[in-house]
């Protein structure tokens, strides 16, 4: 579906907007602004170049809606896999505990669910942002930000002043740390005690085994749930590749500055020894020497996202666990809402009100999504025993409409996540004033 032309912002030629961070959140905010006609949008990225990174990522219906607003969704679909459903299975014997069809998503919410490679999503957002006039400055290490006057100091360069600075610098956000320190608060990310392995297999590795070929051919996301761990897997790259991500208890990562560690394939295989044969076949195919284990951390809900001319967005504002596939989606919604509200401003004096409304609309929803991801992880990782048996029974009953302990497949959670058009909501809320 082609994106409709968006109304041009009254202050399109007036406001100067600086975005710190060129991840998905930063680029989503850039596209959200330039698609409204803003002419002075600069994205600062510390990395010396932009490259394809990451693995698979789920694009839920609410994120599809935002990407369509941005004119980006059509660029993704040739490389995407449209999910037909999800299957939750017991780790040891591959027994299906729950099957959720996604056939209802487009009729109910207007959009399907896709899975893509993160690099494809990132490139689509970057291309769209640059196409519409955003400036990207790589190798731009931010040394300081002045909250009151909107000045940004990039290492080795003179200060630049913006009317709004959007901090999309991720869970390790230095700008968030400064903001919290100004409030007398301590900025601290919280180790969850969990880590993740990420594996991508190619179709050529899987075609000779019928059970593996079925996995990559079938547009279904699978969760294998076990004691203190679960694994999610699905095809990406138009079924040319297969994405596998584990979440598991680990004490080996999280102490280094970058929260990652080079991982041993042998250790990974030992960790999941005893899981079902089909999954273990996949893990044995993981390329040698390419495995990385990274720590999963969260941040407690912040007291606020705004300080004068600086506003937080994406993981800098609401870092989450990946268990309901909403990290990128919520960052995308942030960018869409912020662009919508700033486009409503007729005077620079209106901007502080737009920022406050952004926080009022976005913070409760994003914080709720973070909590839903947390409780889902707890439910998926229950050790074998009576509590696990009760969880499995609840998963089976959820196939017929009961509440699911896996909130990603829970109908009521889906309704809250997928049923809200955040752009329309922002437009209506601003118009009521």
Label the model's feature ranges.
Residues 31, 35, 41, 48, ...:
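Preference for well-ordered, secondary-structure-rich cores of eukaryotic proteins
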Residues 53-128:
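Active-site-adjacent segment of FAD-dependent monooxygenases/related oxidoreductases
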Residues 3-14, 18, 78, 88, ...:
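C-terminal helical "tail/cap" subdomain of flavin- and related membrane-associated enzymes
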Residues 50-51, 174-175, 319-321:
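Catalytic P-loop NTPase motifs of RecA-like helicase/translocase cores
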Residues 93, 123-288:
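Conserved FAD-binding catalytic core of PHBH/FMO-like flavoproteins
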Residues 19-36, 44-47, 166-167, 233, ...:
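Conserved mid-domain beta->alpha element of the FAD-binding
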Residues 16, 39-40, 241:
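Residues at the starts of beta-strands that form the adenosine-phosphate
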